[in-house]
Amino acid sequence: MSDIEKEENKDSSPPTTPPTGGPTKNNDIDDDEKENKIERSLTENLNKRFYNNNNNNSNNSNGEEIEDIDYKNFKTIKEFGYYYNDKGELRSIEGEEKFKFINQQQYDRLGDIIVKTIQNKMKSEPINLEEHWIPKGETNQCNIFTSKDFFENPTKLMVFINGSGAVKSGQWARSLCINDTLNTGSILPYLNDAISNDFSIIVLNPNYNVFEERIIEEGEEQKEKAKEEEEKKDDNGKLLKKKRVDNSIKGSENSNNHILTVYDEFIKKSPAKEIVIVAHSFGGVNTTYLLDNRGEEIADRLKSIAFTDSVHSLSPKSSSFTKSFFADENKTKNWVKSDKKLNTDLGFSKLQGCNIASSGHRVHEFTSSACRVPLFQFILNSLKK
């Protein structure tokens, strides 16, 4: 039995999605609390699966003391002693060993650099996506990616929305990019399939909500400017009171705002007659929010939505368009974690308002890679109707 089936058997009301209309302050708080709760749950489960050691442990698995290293200024995977082989596996330069967790700073910094590695692959042959920093003209920005034909392709567009947490544009699961392969943890295989099927592409970045240092050379100017602002002195040489620096990104203050901003500034301007959405985990909540707030605009062009272990739910506040679109088995499907055979029909979920099927994998992070083949077939079939 999938988690969604178990949840529907509970005697409890489903969480509500935000009401239609633009985002409000109270809605933003509710969304953030919900997103943080899901993120904490996913992170706790992840740590239990991959790590048995304490994050603050100064010894390795052999009981040997580990040198106290400050990883925050590392800028390449090589500095950590690792590289990606031809199979997309992270391996140590010496010994070809799998990643060894030392502490959270090491893991987080390596994860940040791996994001840049994946995004560089997205911008290189054979994928060749273009990077856009939004909003234009602002110091605090986040990046999204589009295919070079995004504003010219008149036929079909594929939209990618990842889940919540530490993942950024180009990733399904950071843990898999580190502990398994880029083929399971990143969206690179999906991008290749989209290109081979002549889709234009846009890859969103819903978790990039505050300005971050751009790894390598980028971001140094903004970093120094912020430092100078904090260290200003008066005429007597006394340090002035530091101003609180707001690093939030306008239009992307939270994941739902990001979705609407990218829709208004990019997706709406695409000439594609047919639009499909692929969304993982909390990306399903963002997709629901998009339909609740831009349903009338996108209705004529939206052909299908493919979820991978989405955590969304519908409520009386969900729009009629969202409910009807999700209820159509030819337009919406959620491939959930399950021990059933890949693509096994698991029926209709009242909680989520859509049909669900087995992803062929029992672990949440693996669902996107596990169901890629039937998911693409579902999308292609939706364009024929």
UniProtKB/Swiss-Prot annotation:
GO terms for biological process: regulatory ncRNA-mediated heterochromatin formation. Residues 220-238 have a biased composition (Basic and acidic residues). One of its GO terms (cellular component) is nucleus. Disulfide bonds: none annotated. Gene3D superfamilies: alpha/beta hydrolase. Residues 1-65, 220-239 are annotated as: Disordered. Residues 52-62 have a biased composition (Low complexity). Belongs to the ARB2A family. This is Cotranscriptional regulator ARB2A homolog. It comes from Dictyostelium discoideum.
